[in-house]
Amino acid sequence: MRTTSLLLLLGSLMAVPATQAADASDWLNRLAEADRQNSFQGTFVYERNGSFSTHEIWHRVESDGAVRERLLQLDGARQEVVRVDGRTQCISGGLADQLADAQLWPVRKFDPSQLASWYDLRLVGESRVAGRPAVVLAVTPRDQHRYGFELHLDRDTGLPLKSLLLNEKGQLLERFQFTQLNTGAAPAEDQLQAGAECQVVGPAKADGEKTVAWRSEWLPPGFTLTRSFMRRSPVTPDPVACLTYGDGLARFSVFIEPLHGAMVGDARSQLGPTVVVSKRLQTDDGGQMVTVVGEVPLGTAERVALSIRPEAAAQK
């Protein structure tokens, strides 16, 4: 990912009077509903860690409110995903390894009402992306535990034409940007049909009835548990405990897997905005590996990983 100063990004934009600052919340509300109100097709580029890829998307809102969507990577190995109402129907290529909670195009599911406590929201200017007029919003974190965004929203539909994810220094971590967007006609049926290599995805292998007996003793302010479940490990017969957390915009997941005495070391890595931190937790049954994966700063992920405890121990 190329480094870009947030000040330079914002300084090149037209200033908006302070009296319009309250409109930022209105635009975020439009963004939150845009993909359920607009059919479209287009091409966008994705940049992370200096690597670029180009994707085509077909997105159709049906008369009953259901949303059908197909994404196809246009360069490199063929990669495709088809979804209905956010549920993956089929997938192919390397996307199969990126499926869990992956953000495959520039719309993030969030609750606008939660954001004002943890982010400063401002209209900072106007721009033009993919030949379409846009308004520019700065979403700046109030602490060091989350990243900031610069959002260029289509004036006509509220759809995100460009999204920049920025660290605390204003450096670019991730970019989505449409190069072409057509909202004038809904995609045809054949454009939503999967290719022959797209593999049907079965029901998730999770046991939602089992209680997850783990919790975090520390969370970044504003982050709450959004889901907890047990799933089967892809490499062992052991169940893996899964906890997901979010603040209304940012999110991360915690996975706890038995080690049975295996000697596995701690690890940490970052690719663009995504961090992976693994910490060994000593327990009487041979240890557990705690792994935090998400789009939060590395130090935050490490602190969460170190705070994971068995439920009974955490309540003492």
From Swiss-Prot:
It comes from the Bacteria. GO terms for molecular function: antisigma factor binding. Residues 1-21 form the signal peptide. One of its GO terms (cellular component) is outer membrane-bounded periplasmic space. GO terms for biological process: alginic acid biosynthetic process; regulation of polysaccharide biosynthetic process. InterPro entries: MucB/RseB_C, MucB/RseB_C_sf, MucB/RseB_N, MucB_RseB. Its main location: periplasm. It is found in: Periplasm. It holds the Pfam family MucB_RseB. Keywords: Alginate biosynthesis, Periplasm, Signal. Belongs to the RseB family. Negative regulator of the sigma factor AlgU. Plays a role in the differentiation of P.aeruginosa into the alginate-producing form. Inactivation of mucB causes conversion to mucoidy. This is Sigma factor AlgU regulatory protein MucB. It comes from Pseudomonas aeruginosa (strain ATCC 15692 / DSM 22644 / CIP 104116 / JCM 14847 / LMG 12228 / 1C / PRS 101 / PAO1). The lineage of its organism: Bacteria, Pseudomonadati, Pseudomonadota, Gammaproteobacteria, Pseudomonadales. The gene is mucB.
